[in-house]
């Protein structure tokens, strides 16, 4: 999963994994970070919100609730489409991401431990509900009640008892 201000192209173009994945017979699926072209107010005017900043959640606030459902898209809809059209062993699917994508990977793995074989996060956002630059997006997408934000915050999920066997987190040097 790509990071904040990015799109699916970041993973596809910058990752040095393609040759090795091909050798191993692995498919790498690169979904976008948010819906595109919905002409929602402020969708493209702020790097902290809208296109490129979907935070891998399911919005509950209008007008975002119609299309900003990246959590359900990645956990449910996309795997169903993949399973329907490709002969992949879905019992071996894993999830990984960078920055905001690392946040998405962790929350999806924590909330769906039987769906993913592994989870890796590179420089992930781990507590978006407390950061000033992401809490604004949470308010617009999920509303003012911060208890609703906890389902999209990995620290809050761990405190609530959500668990995934092992998560690789790399912050770099």
Name each region found by the language model.
Residues 1-173:
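Non-catalytic cap/lid and distal C-terminal segments of serine-dependent acyl enzymes
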């Amino acid at each position: 999963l790509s990071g904040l201000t990015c799109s699916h192209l970041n993973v596809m173009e910058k990752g040095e994994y393609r040759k090795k994945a091909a050798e191993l017979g692995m498919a790498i699926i690169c979904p976008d970070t948010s819906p595109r072209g919905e002409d929602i107010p402020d969708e493209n005017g702020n790097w902290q919100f809208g296109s490129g900043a979907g935070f891998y959640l399911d919005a509950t606030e209008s007008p975002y609730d119609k299309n900003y459902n990246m959590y359900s898209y990645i956990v449910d809809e996309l795997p169903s489409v993949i399973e329907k059209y490709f002969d992949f062993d879905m019992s071996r699917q894993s999830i990984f991401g960078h920055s905001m994508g690392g946040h998405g990977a962790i929350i999806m793995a924590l909330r769906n431990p039987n769906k993913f074989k592994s989870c890796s996060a590179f420089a992930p956002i781990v507590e978006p509900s407390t950061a000033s630059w992401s809490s604004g997006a949470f308010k617009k997408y999920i509303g003012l009640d911060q208890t609703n934000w906890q389902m999209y915050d990995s620290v809050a999920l761990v405190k609530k008892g959500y668990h995934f066997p092992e998560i690789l987190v790399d912050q770099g040097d």
